[in-house]
């Protein structure tokens, strides 16, 4: 097993010669998330940290790896963390760029901002990573004991000064010394194996641990695998497989443990090393299958092709590494006709799929050879002796041939006793009810049942699909399986790909287990294999195995499956070895539902679409492509091929025979000259060995590209639609002859001749739908259709890969039936699409148009290959198609652009640049697609094409409803859309002067969901946003089928979003701004982002819409109703509150039980009324935000924003976009929130110009971006720069905004005003009051420029004039309940009384907090337990009676404090603190390090030192920005209060008075933190912890109960330091006012500011700025709910006077002057007198 036999070597050596034409380059060092397992994964999977020996090994290997990457690009961008330190399958250390998230501050060296990445910086990060890995323990008592050497090394590596850190050489030397007896490589290999071994589902590559993990307990069936040892390949097909011994689990548990302890047994090493690797074949599910495949040549060829296809993309588009690898793993194909023959003779990829390929997809001799090979060469393997193969035909080699001889759709009935297909008609009616077990086998044995009438098993579905399930498909499958599982009374013990059945409507149900009782141990839970009771969680385990197999389908086994973390975590949890650790079905359903709900997806629709895409084709008459991306593009009318022009081929007759002609085909003039000629691509020498794609009708393509999986079309309805389409065949035929001479190189809607009649070559060879991607070295095909005069036509339409039938085919590339296709053999592997132009489409979301169902060329339904769209709608855009042709002719090489999506998107983008100057045109293209070389001649040709004679007529803006249903549409607009209502308003690209090539909404869907799902995307790319046009186009329904994405979750958000966008655009001077004068989204927008407004708000607004009788959905129409209801609720609240106050006074006098009962009821009513008022205020805020969202642009239109100032008066300018205007996005799985749809990608980074332009993006207000920007923009631009940017946009669009209210100019103008108003409202005190020049400039601009043309801007000018007063008023209003005066009058007693008379203590319940482990804090009174507020804090009491009655203090000195109650002092101190806090702004807490604020109380800057900062202090703001230093005033005040507290105590002349004051301050502090005044509480704690106070003898006589408060204060301080958002958790911060500690909040923000703000390309990390904005937004959150205590001016004056008196005093000197601060030494009775005399004598001598 260790070495490959000579025959095998010879086979691979010979096979390798066929691959020599490839230019091999070294693979990327770090294919991120592909083969690597990170240290974080290892730690979390095995649930313990590294041992000391492992730490030495990892340190050594990392140091060596670090030295090897010193000159690599990753060295400058790497930050070593547990997530970026990874191990590949060989155990080698790898570094991965974790671009999707900022590293934690603990791993970033302190000097990083100044020095960047250096060896010293990486050593610091490595030390921090190792420290974290060593301390990763689930329980405190398991903390490791480290040796002195290791502890010292880690400490040195994490030294603050880089010069004190050891160098690499010394680290390596020390590690090698410590690793003398062991091999560090072996230990790291063991760690790598652990990361893969812990999860049995994921441990495909670790064969030695085959049965020692989760799957342990059931031996593999003896006859599952071949019985012979590897031998001569020419005589023994089993030589392709490992021996049977590998399949057997260890004989005993001891053997299992021994195998588990070995790092990795040597025997499977050859399986993991090239060229013999674990290539997994389609349809294989079991671990045994995976071992059988270990020496499969097909797997190796696929993997080599895979790596070649991944190579170019990984290097050219590093931002899409993750997508590239994931996509390319789905692109398995064969190379070369010779190789294909050899492969087919040695090992079938999948018998079921192979039969289809042999019959319909590949040549006939393949089927014959494979059918003949296995039964003859392996007679010993009988069907009745292969129980393990009952569901996996490929498991037994002998079975494959017999399977091919049986029913083509089902395989052998004997071989598969209980197949999966079920009658689809019944399943439609049954819904989610599982079919009875008796009926399934009976129906499935009907050989005549077709795919359209049966359900499919997952194995059939995957085989026909030819690729693994994508992420959202896995979520849908998981939800459907679990939902079906809940309906079962008896939980199935065994689920696999064969008995998980998918009905036509997407319903999943479970078939019976194998009739012979054979189970694959992969799909058995450990407890089931041990013959324990089958529980629900055992079935959950089976579902996880099924999902993992579906996700791993056709992925090479030595590649780590790249799944998103959220999905992977769920699968791992579901596959836990112990049932108790697995989630229940309900819990897993909740996770799946939240994911799908966020994206507006429906699981049944997704699965129904998948099933429809594979089941509508009759296998006998329709061909299925090889695998994944080379799927079928349905044969549209006059479909043309997309071949190379190697030897030229011309069709000489109307059949499919092709005749070669010597040399290139003579070319005719270009198609744009309206002549019938052959495109130059077929005749150009430059296109030899290049796939040529003729662009299809973009009007149809656009709809299908954006086809949503969750479309509301039912499959059966779609079938009816197909039939209706089929009836138009004759009309299409007539249209062909009428249009073919007029439309050159564009689509002629008519049936395809080859598709109209079945032809024998198409059945035995490769028919039209077999594969579209031409082989790089294969012959070119040119098909001429009868009656078209040689005009080649591209496919009429095509679908995104996952939406196309039988796989994913590239756009516009269809190889017509003919023997040549079969002789081509292999196809070039699919390359991942370009990062900027396109990515593998995988979105289930759709465009605004009608979503067409995928329709293969099903000759039974539609003998003419189903014309996809009606004949009158087939007008194409010649300019766009010619542009695509030029692009492909230039760049389609080595498989690039094989699938046509790249060319389509690039062509549409370029087409959008029409009407620009040539220089601007060239600059925009070069910047957008900067990774390609654009020849000047090519740019000239493209410029000529897009600005050709046909352009002006197409560039005119279409008015709503101007386009008839059957009139020819522009190339970019869906021809399926019968109406274009609202097009100009909601699709800004259509008003780009050029008319825009596409619907921006659809383009947005494509860009975000289907074309750029890579990890990173640079440039202005579209994101998924609420598509408001979907429900505005009910006439887009065809046959009663509604438009896409109207499920329960998306419906609410779409409805609400629709309110914000008028149907007719509204007048230019829309009065909405005057009705909704508050444009600021508020702190909640920055903090909660998309979750700011919950589903209740959406539903309420939707109800408002339904109540409108006049049909208006304008915001202005909603406002009066809402305002009226809000006013009524406020009035009721005030009346009830006044009645409550009267009853309260009566209760005080009478103390009657009846009054008390009524008071209790009234309290509940008041709470309910207050909640209602707050809710209505939130709805009002939402409508205000949606007014701003009304003017949002799709991100694809954002380049207009960047250089709009230079645009001519009638067009929008696409000036060259350089690095200064880029944005970077990344994919995330956002956590479930309010149910609102969220974006698939969020902004990761951007340059200042790009970030400012992104303010104009749709949903920028709703998603919180605007508010976060307003908090943080000073890090990258000054207020003057920002104002200049806004005013430029306003001035550039002002004159044009009033010409067309629906234009993009209007949207830019209105959004600019909204952003400007939000800025003024939110940051007036920060940016405008202190900067008179900025304020004057804005006022002058509004007065002189805006007001003469737009009177609605008057409110903005008024806002500037009363800015200060308005800001102060809004801050003092509690929850916006009423007018300020009424609020002060009414809410104050309500809040106070509710707090005082709350018997259940709701308002006094303390926040949840804890002491973090290992913080070193020792609590003397509560060592044995962890602090909680409930346990640490007794019931609140103010001790009013304990300290005597209230007395007016007139004398000075500490005695006056004892004359006031604790509550009086607490309330007045709170009001004093609140007065200061209300004046601060979140921006004041930013960049505090530059102000000298340090993480020590002693370092709080004094008044004298605050102005002179250290030279080392470097500001994070721009140098010319003058920062407001109000934070220093807050901190100085806090320091003064602490000093006052300490001074009052140490200046008390008696111990008794000191005890009284200590008690007083402790009880005040206790009241403070109970009432959430953490600022004063921490200030008092600071005073009490002063050294002079702590040394006071009064502590010794302080009552124990009072002394405990000190420990509680310390615990609260620890809690406040633990989490930057701890005060925002729970309901208390909403119900009660809060005053945070300014110093601690500044420290939290400082911690977030640690690390680099900019990336290597100069872009600012928006993810970091977003987190800072969230923390800073707490300031405004707490200011919204102020305390309503009654002020006591006299007491406040006394407190201010005492605090000012001790401000800046030295407490130690004050303490030294007071003898009460010294401990009395016991002695003789005269000792005190002697001491007094000595003191007096000393005074006389001085």
UniProtKB/Swiss-Prot annotation:
Residues 215-288, 365-455, 703-727, 744-876, 948-1006, 1028-1076 are annotated as: Disordered. GO terms for molecular function: guanyl-nucleotide exchange factor activity. CDD domains: REM. The modification Phosphoserine is found at residues 267, 951. Residues 1239-1367 form the N-terminal Ras-GEF domain. Highly expressed in the brain and at low levels in the ovary. In the brain it is most prominently expressed in the cerebellum where it is restricted to the granular Purkinje cell layer. This is Kinase non-catalytic C-lobe domain-containing protein 1. It comes from Mus musculus. The gene is Kndc1.
